[in-house]
Amino acid sequence: MRLLIGTLFVVVCTAGFFMSSVLADNTPAANAVQINIFNYKFDPETATVPAGTTVTWTNKDEIPHTVASSDKGFKGSSGLDTGDSYSYTFDKPGTYKYYCTLHPFMTATIVVTAKGG
């Protein structure tokens, strides 16, 4: 009986350790924003973030897309196949419009505010 309780204790502790690791890995950073590309849209179409935020675009569509700055305000991506991601850190406040070069009707905006404001 003592062996059974000891074994159960070890199993529960081990499972708890692994679950906390998995949950910690899935928690987004405070200075990170996720934008999904799906159904020929960027979601959300407008994101407001403080300077220093990393924005990650993930293509969840069945066809390739890109992320391209409308005014060369930031470095854009190359083609993103299904499941591919592209990240960029916005350090300067401003309004950044972007689009998909393969589907120019797909447009969106990142508004970067000063840190803390």
Regions found by a protein language model. Give the residues of each.
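Extracytoplasmic copper-binding redox domains, predominantly the cupredoxin/blue-copper superfamily
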Residues: 2-11, 16-117
